[in-house]
Amino acid sequence: MKRFLDRRTILAVAVLILAPLLWFAPVILGGKTLIPADNLYQFQPWASLAGQYGVGVPHNELLSDLVLENFVWKSFLREAISTGQLPLWNPHLFTGVPFLAAGQHSALYPLSIVFYILPLPLAYGVFTWLQLAVAALGMYVFGRALRLGRAASAFAGLAYAFSGFFVVSVVFTMIIAAAAWLPWLLACIETIVRKQEEKGDVAYSPIPYVLGGAVVLGLQALAGHPEIVVITLLVAGFYSLLRLLVLWRRIGALGRAARLAGWLLVLVVIGIALGAIQIVPLF
């Protein structure tokens, strides 16, 4: 416990949480928003009012999905929740379409609570900050699981959270929400295998780490971007195979490696089951 509560660890965690806050301070603290509202003026009826309101060329017309879809989804969710309704059906498109089953609105994702309690222009900034912090902390934990030093792990966390992928995806909330959990899952896998390496041919129960990894995978499934879940499972599968082969070579016990492989499959099954409330209706 002392290892996780010393001052250097607390400092590293604080930096990883505050760095995204500093980056998005104009949105969270300065009254700005990530919602590209100016993109609406490319379309009627708003285009007819562009001159009247002094709206010129949009800052980035490729980001229209956020204001045309995601913002509308979040508004519909808030409306449904305020009236005590479960938003199973969207009556506003043609004769109506399934809504909750669609998934990309992230309605069931725990951190989406910020969209239900904060004004939407502010909520997008707060949500993005929290997700980048989750991503940074996850990579820090993965680095520590690999026995990297605190500084190296913190640098890895910053590099991941501020990577090109996250930077260009900040306006796609479901993408960053899902991708943020990848290093947490890898950290669970690494811990499960490394503990067996430390114990050699002596059996141990990895249940706490299996359950932790399952929760991580379930959260990722609820985030609303199944493509990221598929990519995560591929990465986790290849990483698990590599680590199990290394484990077999180091301790020379094929049975122990096979046993851990079974536990990792249990992790995936439980994780998918936790996210099934969103996955099953989607398909």
For each of these PLM feature ranges, what is it?
Residues 3-4, 98-104, 220-230:
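Short secondary-structure boundary segments
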Residues 16, 134-146, 150-196, 201, ...:
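Membrane-embedded helix bundles of polyisoprenyl
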